[in-house]
Amino acid sequence: VHKLIAIAIVMILAFNVAASEQGGFNEETSVEGTDIISIDYPHQASAGKSFGINVKLTEEAQNNTTTVNWITQICINSGICYPPETNSLENSGEGIWNGTIIPGDDVTYVNWRIDLIDSNENTTRVPENGFGWKVWSDCWYDGSEWGGNDSSCQDDNDDNVPGFITPLTLAAIGTAGLMTRRD
């Protein structure tokens, strides 16, 4: 009975994790209460095309900020996310910092956050933890369905297990195995 309960709990948790993210919906963190007034960016990423942002700082931050870094992470249609990369934004004057990246051919979405570095080398992250923004591409795969307004990246061979599901399955099996060993 304990084994059955443990397996049921693991399956419920795995389903909740898999269902918690819905493909194609962009995410945006509020900049209220930060040194950032606004962030302008495209609301869709495209493979091989420029993806840029403009960050406008408060007047106080303009006088004290020496560097603005854009920490990006690109996730691809196979379910893999590349390690985060630091991109230094250029100060174009009047408190506006801008930069550009070019996502690869199989981009699913772009995650990012902003790091503000002051003259004392203190770093303020927006948001404090994780990535605050996620912008989906015009041709994406979220592990169960294709989406976007461009179908050129879609793989006709859907016989394999999607990348997002494999780690969840392995975690569920491992947790169930550990729980049954304790009994």
Q: Where do the model's predicted regions map?
A:
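Generic low-complexity, intrinsically disordered sequence content enriched
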Residues: A8, V17, A172-G174
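Sec-dependent signal peptide recognition
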Residues: H2-V10, T166-T169
